[in-house]
Regions:
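Aromatic (Trp/Tyr) and acidic
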Residues: 2-89, 121-143, 174-192, 196, ...
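Amphipathic alpha-helical segments of tetratricopeptide repeats
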Residues: 103-104, 158-162, 202-206, 244, ...
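Asp-box/WD-like beta-propeller blade repeats and closely related beta-sheet repeat scaffolds
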Residues: 118-127, 134, 149-172
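C-terminal beta-rich recognition modules with glycine/proline-rich loops and embedded aromatic residues
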Residues: 197, 255, 315-323, 328-420, ...
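Accessory beta-strand-rich segments of carbohydrate-active enzymes
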Residues: 439-467, 471, 480, 487
Length: 661
C-alpha cells in the first residue's frame, strides 16, 4: 500500500487553538474539577497504570490491566488536550511528567502498555486499552514535537505487529488499535503498520462477532444489540482512516454507510448514539446514551470531517457536543452522568434502566470509562474549530477561541451556539505573518447567512464551506451571522413505539422543558472513598405540595407536575417565540435564550409516582390533553432533568381547547 494522506483537511498542532469566552470558562472549571483531579481521586484506576503498571485490583486480575489501560489512557488523552487547549501551565507540567514516566516504564521489547508478566497479553483489552494510552502520547507529541515520544509509540505498535501477527487477534474492541496504527503510519510511513491493519480487517471479515467487519459496515442493515453503542460510535471512522492512508474507496464508503445508517436508526435528538443497557437500540424518548459514546462519536465525526472535507460532519459534532455532552455535566464540572436520555425526570442511583448508579451524577464510578471521556470531549471539539486545507484555513465547528496560524492570531468572539453572531478578528503576531485565505462553514440549518468584512456587507454562499474572496491580514474584522430558525423535528421511532414525538431545535441546540431539580449529595460508591468537596448526586424533580390529604394528593399530582406536556400535531415554527433575556455570564448555568412554545397539558401521559422515567402514554398515537399549557423551553445542555421529546396532541382536540378559550 502506497503511503499517502488523502485527508482533505488537517488539524493544527495541539495548542495552536486556545479556548476563550464561555468555553474558556468551562475548561477552567473542568481543570478545577474532574479534568484536573480524576487521577488523584482514583490513582490505581487512572494515575499509575502506564507509569508503574499498578492498576486497581478490585476489578480482578483478569480485567485490571485492560480496564486500567483504557480508562487511564483515555483520561491522559483528554488531560493532555485539556492542558494545551487551555494553556494552563500547571496542567502542561503534569502532562510532561506523565509522558516522561510512561517512557521510563517502556520494556526492552518496546511494549508500553499496562500488562505485566503473568497477564494475558492476547487479551482483547491489551490492544484496545493500549491504543488509548498511545493516542494520549501522540497528542503529547502533537503539542511538543518530541521525537522520542513518537519513536516510543512507533515501537509499541511494532510490538503488536510482531506479537499479534496472523490470526492472533481478538474480535471485540481490539481492532480499535487500527486508529493508532494509521496515525503512526501517517507519521512514519512504516508499511508494517498498514500490513497489520489489513490483516486485522481480514481476520474480522472471517471471524465477525459484533458486526465490525467491512461487509457489515457496507450492509444496509443495522442490527440492534449487535454491539456496544459506544463501540459503534468509536469505530465508524475506522475504514475511512484506512482509506486516508491509501486503501481503496470501498473503505471510505464503508464508513460513510455506517455513519448514515447509524444516524437514521440509532441517533437520538440530543446527538447521542443509543446505548440501551449499553448496546445499540432503536431510538425513543427515554433511551439512554453513554458518555463514552458521546466522546467517541464526536471523535469519529471529526475524523470523517477531516478525511472527506464535508461540512455536515461538523453540523453533527455541534449537535452531539452542545446537547448530549453538555446535558450530562454538572455545571461546576465536578460530576457527570454515565447514562442520560432526552426525557429524564430523575437522575439517581436507581433511575437507570441499565444498571444501578448509571444515571447518578458522580465524579468517578467503579468503572470510570465515562468520567475520563468527559474530560476529552470539549478539547477535542475545540481542536476542530479551525482546520488547514490546501487552499487555506477552514473554520469548521464554532465556539469562542483564539487560533494561531502562520504568524496570525485570529480571535473568534461569539456567544454561539446561543446567539447568531460570530466575530473574527485578525491580528499579526509574527514577522513571518502571511495573508490568509479562509472558508467558513455554513450549517445545513442556516439558509440565509450574512457577512460583513471591515464594515461592508459582502456576498456569501449559503451552504458548505463559504469562501470569502479576500486575503485576510492584520486588522481585518469579519462578522458572520448565522440566523437560527426554529425547527420542529419528528422522531422516527417506528422500530419502537411509532409515537413520532416532537422536538424543538434552534440552530444547533435542542430545546427542552426543564423539570425543576433538587440535587442531593451523598458519599456514593466510588472504588476509593471521595475526599472532602467531592460527592455523588441524586437529582430528583420538585413537585409542588397539594395541601390535600394523602389520598387526594395522589389524584392531584397529575395536575401539579410541570412536565406533563404535549405539543400539537402540525405545530409550526412560526408559533414559537424566541426570547433573548440579555443574560451574560456562564451560559450553561443561565441561558441567554429561551423559547415560548404553545403546549397542552397531558394529565394522563406521565406516571404520577414513577421510579424511572417512562415513555409518555398515548392512545392511538396521541396524548389526551385538557387545557392549554404555555411552555418555556431552554437549551438541553442547561438541564439535568427535562422533557425533550413531546407526545402529539390531535389537531381537533387542540382546536376545541382553543375554541373554548
Amino acid at each position: 500500500m502506497t503511503n499517502q494522506n488523502r485527508q482533505k483537511l488537517h488539524r493544527l498542532p495541539l495548542g495552536d487553538i486556545r479556548a476563550a469566552g464561555w468555553l474558556g470558562e468551562q475548561l477552567r472549571r473542568n481543570i478545577a474539577g474532574m479534568g484536573g483531579h480524576l487521577h488523584e481521586l482514583e490513582p490505581g484506576m487512572i494515575a499509575t497504570p502506564y507509569t508503574t503498571r499498578e492498576t486497581y485490583e478490585g476489578w480482578g486480575r483478569d480485567r485490571a490491566p485492560g480496564w486500567g489501560a483504557e480508562i487511564s489512557g483515555n483520561y491522559w488523552w483528554g488531560f493532555i488536550e485539556l492542558a494545551f487547549t487551555s494553556g494552563d501551565p500547571d496542567m502542561i507540567d503534569r502532562a510532561h511528567a506523565w509522558a516522561n514516566a510512561v517512557l521510563a516504564n517502556r520494556r526492552e521489547d518496546g511494549y508500553l502498555g499496562t500488562y505485566r508478566e503473568g497477564d494475558d497479553f492476547f487479551d482483547d483489552y491489551n490492544a484496545w486499552g493500549t491504543s488509548c494510552g498511545m493516542n494520549a502520547l501522540l497528542a503529547y507529541y502533537d503539542a511538543t514535537g518530541r521525537q522520542d515520544v513518537l519513536e516510543a509509540v512507533h515501537g509499541c505498535m511494532l510490538w503488536f505487529c510482531d506479537n499479534w501477527s496472523g490470526d492472533k487477534k481478538t474480535r471485540y474492541a481490539g481492532m480499535t488499535i487500527v486508529e493508532c496504527m494509521t496515525r503512526v503510519y501517517g507519521l512514519t510511513g512504516d508499511e508494517r503498520l498498514m500490513q497489520f491493519c489489513c490483516s486485522y480487517f481480514d481476520f474480522i471479515e472471517r471471524n465477525d462477532l459484533f458486526d465490525g467487519s467491512l461487509s457489515a459496515f457496507l450492509s444496509p442493515e443495522l442490527h440492534y444489540n449487535s454491539t456496544h453503542g459506544s463501540l459503534y460510535a468509536n469505530e465508524i471512522d475506522r475504514p475511512a482512516l484506512m482509506y486516508a492512508c491509501g486503501a481503496d474507496e470501498t473503505y471510505l464508503e464503508a464508513s460513510l454507510n455506517a455513519y448514515r445508517k447509524g444516524k437514521e436508526k440509532a441517533l437520538l435528538p440530543n446527538g447521542g448514539i443509543t446505548c440501551e443497557s449499553e448496546y445499540l437500540a432503536p431510538v425513543g424518548c427515554v433511551v439512554e446514551t453513554e458518555y463514552c459514546a458521546i466522546t467517541f462519536y464526536n471523535k469519529s465525526l471529526a475524523n470523517l470531517a477531516q478525511i472527506t472535507g464535508e461540512p455536515y460532519f461538523a453540523d453533527d459534532m455541534e449537535q452531539t457536543v452542545f446537547n448530549a455532552a453538555e446535558g450530562a455535566r454538572k455545571k461546576d464540572e465536578r460530576a457527570i452522568a454515565y447514562l442520560t436520555a432526552p426525557n429524564q425526570i430523575m437522575a439517581s442511583s436507581t433511575s437507570s434502566y441499565a444498571n444501578e448508579g448509571h444515571q447518578v451524577y458522580a465524579p468517578c464510578v467503579p468503572v470510570a470509562c465515562c468520567p475520563v471521556n468527559s474530560v476529552r470531549v470539549l478539547p477535542e471539539f475545540l481542536r476542530n474549530t479551525a482546520l488547514e486545507g490546501e487552499d487555506g484555513l477552514y473554520f469548521s465547528t464554532y465556539a469562542p477561541c483564539i487560533v494561531n496560524y502562520r504568524g496570525m492570531k485570529i480571535t473568534l468572539e461569539t456567544d454561539y451556539p446561543f446567539r447568531e453572531t460570530l466575530t473574527f478578528r485578525f491580528e499579526k503576531v509574527g514577522e513571518t505573518a502571511v495573508s490568509l485565505t479562509c472558508r467558513f462553514r455554513i450549517p445545513a440549518w442556516c439558509d440565509s447567512p450574512r457577512a460583513v468584512l471591515n464594515g461592508e456587507e459582502i456576498a456569501l454562499s449559503s451552504d458548505g464551506y463559504a469562501k470569502v474572496a479576500h486575503a485576510f491580514s492584520d486588522g481585518d474584522v469579519f462578522v458572520l451571522t448565522l440566523p437560527m430558525q426554529v425547527r420542529i423535528y419528528e422522531m422516527q421511532d417506528d422500530d419502537r413505539l411509532s409515537m413520532h414525538p416532537l422536538s424543538v431545535f434552534r440552530g444547533p441546540l435542542l430545546y427542552s422543558l426543564p423539570v425543576p431539580e433538587i440535587w442531593q449529595g451523598w458519599p456514593g460508591h466510588s472504588a476509593t472513598p471521595l475526599p472532602e468537596g467531592w460527592q455523588w448526586y441524586n437529582v430528583h424533580p420538585v413537585i409542588p405540595p397539594s395541601g390535600l390529604d394523602v389520598y387526594d394528593d395522589m389524584g392531584m399530582r397529575r395536575r401539579l407536575i410541570t412536565w406533563n406536556a404535549a405539543l400539537a400535531e402540525g405545530l409550526s415554527a412560526d408559533e414559537i417565540t424566541v426570547t433573548d433575556n440579555g443574560a451574560d455570564g456562564y451560559p450553561w448555568e443561565n441561558s441567554p435564550i429561551s423559547l415560548s412554545v404553545p403546549g397542552y397539558r397531558a394529565p394522563y401521559s406521565y406516571a404520577p409516582y414513577p421510579q424511572k422515567t417512562l415513555d409518555p402514554y398515548v392512545q392511538n398515537g396521541y396524548a389526551y390533553v385538557d387545557e392549554e399549557m404555555p411552555l418555556t423551553l431552554i437549551p438541553y445542555g442547561c438541564t439535568a432533568l427535562r422533557i425533550s421529546c413531546f407526545p402529539k396532541a390531535k389537531a381537533e382536540m387542540v382546536n376545541k381547547l382553543k375554541g373554548d378559550n
